[in-house]
């Protein structure tokens, strides 16, 4: 299974806010054997969001964060309404915020849109993943190896068997 993450927010692109959602989603999805192919950062503008959604090919899951709130620059739900035209989303409960998440399905692709507030996105995605992926969860073993002065090419040869 594979995924794409779309981070929406002018505040991130202009450097005022640090994105905390992409890394969390990537680490969490790995536990469910979902490989993230790319992460894209785009502006809070309907044409940019729709254009990015049109580029989706050969992806199982698309995760969007940001732009679901009540302010005038929160346009993600409007863009999704246009992109999915007559399809109504399933609403995802937001236990600690005001904006619900959205779940669409088009063909074989599941689209999940979460608020950009990290605490809200984390709780909502954990709840969703435990429902959606729980039976598929795998436990990975990770090793951290710290080295000094060893070229990457030599390390690659030494660690080749660990990658399997």
Placement of each model-derived feature along the sequence:
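Non-catalytic beta/alpha edge segments that cap or flank active sites
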Residues: 1-164
């Amino acid at each position: 299974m594979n995924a794409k993450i779309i981070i929406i927010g002018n505040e991130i692109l202009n450097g005022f806010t640090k994105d905390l959602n992409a890394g969390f989603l990537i680490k969490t999805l790995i536990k469910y054997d979902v490989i993230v192919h790319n992460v894209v950062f785009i502006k809070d503008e309907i044409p940019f969001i729709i254009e990015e959604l049109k580029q989706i090919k050969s992806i199982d899951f698309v995760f969007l964060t940001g732009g679901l709130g009540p302010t005038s620059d929160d346009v993600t739900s409007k863009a999704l309404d246009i992109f999915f035209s007559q399809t109504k989303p399933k609403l995802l409960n937001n236990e600690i915020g005001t904006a619900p998440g959205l779940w669409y399905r088009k063909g074989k692709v599941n689209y999940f849109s979460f608020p950009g507030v990290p605490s809200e996105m984390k709780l909502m995605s954990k709840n969703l993943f435990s429902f959606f992926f729980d039976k598929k969860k795998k436990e990975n073993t990770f090793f951290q190896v710290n080295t000094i002065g060893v070229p990457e090419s030599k390390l690659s040869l030494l660690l080749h068997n660990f990658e399997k």
